[in-house]
Amino acid sequence: MEEERRLVWRVLRHWKKFVDGGRFPRRDEIDPWLRGEDGKNCLLIALVSPIELSHFVVVGLNLAVALCSTDTLAGLLLSRAPRVASARRGVMIEGGATLRGADILYRSVLLPIAEDGVTIDHVLGATNYRLLREDEPRLRQGVFQTQWI
């Protein structure tokens, strides 16, 4: 089988193997995505109660930011984690954001993770993005498209 070139689709395919088997993957089963080359574009969010106190456990080098307001890519993904947990489904989102002060277009996937296979305790995120070209109009920040998985 040809290797999937897009990180988001590779991570989604790996996650779906577990979900199609009737359970969410455990953290140790997704750790390979948080290491190595792919890990630079991945993050892991710990879900805690109250949900507003959820926080990053791992943020890949390419997604790291000093402050996580919702107009940054990492902050935007963090703000979506509670919806993923309550829906008990993954979500793919596309839109515009700021990464290290630059405008980008992105495609991200947020996927529930459960240590016991049932109770969601983390959300795995993976993101592909590109800088806006100078000849492209500046886009508003936020989500342009959402697809529940």
Task: Describe the predicted segments one by one.
Residues M1-C68, G75-I149:
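Intrinsically disordered, low-complexity terminal regulatory regions
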